[in-house]
Amino acid sequence: LFPYTTLFRSKYCRFDAPEASGGYYTQDDIRELVNYARERHVTIIPEIEMPAHSEEVLTAYPELSCSGEPYKNADFCVGNEKTFTFLEDVLTEVMELFPSQYIHVGGDEAGKVAWKTCPKCQKRMQDEHLANVDELQSYLIHRVEVFLNAHGRKLLGWDEILQGGLAPNATVMSWRGEQGGID
């Protein structure tokens, strides 16, 4: 999700956390990369994976998962308001570091299995009149899109963001073939 140092690490994670592994880019490293790319007329589009591919985050912050336990599945709990606070904090910092008009949110390969039995996700589905877990994913993507648009950015995602209804201003990248981008 974020292999670079963040302004809010003290709020969410310590550098010496036992779950931490691997290297990271500092904010200065990111700025240097962005400037290097800009000098060559290249735009770096950051990708912050959601709702799936989030094992690292959910191991460090199990309260953002449906189980509330360290890594049981790879999807954020969409019924948990803390998930949105976390994602908005991450996206705010990403927007400060990357000037790209697009922010890629992934949106692919969400398992959605835990959402079917998660009380918070089921309540969100009931409160928002969502028929199924595909629409729950669409709810997350749409809500993130509204946040990004309010900050002058555009949402970019893989073709699975089409499932459950497309957010109005989203741009879709099809990785599963042409048909996914056409449908």
Features from the language model and the residues they span:
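Substrate-binding cleft of carbohydrate-active enzyme catalytic domains
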Residues: 1, 5-153
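Substrate-binding cleft/loops of secretory-pathway carbohydrate-active enzymes
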Residues: 60-64, 113-114, 156-183
